[in-house]
Amino acid sequence: MAPGERKKSSRKKKDPDAPKRSLSAYMFFANENRDIVRAENPGISFGQVGKLLGEKWKALNSEDKLPYENKAEADKKRYEKEKAEYAKKNSA
């Protein structure tokens, strides 16, 4: 292989029927607040939106984060259940 060339990765393709991963508390917060941040800061880049969302998340106290953490916990349980059903269905 010549210098600077990359080896093609041979990662297995993801099954489209596999259950979607659970979202974190931050992701629930970001999804809910992304449009608000964009409206308050028109014309900012995708990366800047992420930075602002991160700053807002860090500024929240644990009481304000609780609803998002509860959603994340519920989504994690959903994912675990769907993952178990998927594994059972595909192991046969």
UniProtKB/Swiss-Prot annotation:
Family matches, as InterPro entries: HMG_box_dom, HMG_box_dom_sf, HMGB
Cell compartments where the protein resides: Nucleus; Chromosome
GO CC list: chromosome; nucleus
DNA-binding region, residue range(s): 19-87
SUPFAM superfamilies the record matches: HMG-box
GO biological process: DNA repair
SMART domains: HMG
Molecular function terms, GO-annotated: DNA binding
Keywords of the record: Chromosome, DNA damage, DNA repair, DNA-binding, Nucleus, Transcription, Transcription regulation
UniProt-annotated stretches for the region Disordered: 1-22, 64-92
Function noted in UniProt: DNA-binding protein that induces severe bending of DNA. Required for DNA-binding by the FACT complex, a general chromatin factor that acts to reorganize nucleosomes. The FACT complex is involved in multiple processes that require DNA as a template such as mRNA elongation, DNA replication and DNA repair. Also augments the fidelity of transcription by RNA polymerase III independently of any role in the FACT complex.
PANTHER family: HIGH MOBILITY GROUP PROTEIN DSP1 (PTHR48112), MITOCHONDRIAL TRANSCRIPTION FACTOR A, ISOFORM B (PTHR48112:SF22)
Subunit (UniProt): Weakly associates with the stable SPT16-POB3 heterodimer to form the FACT complex.
Family: Belongs to the NHP6 family.
Protein name: Non-histone chromosomal protein 6
Lineage: Eukaryota, Fungi, Dikarya, Ascomycota, Saccharomycotina
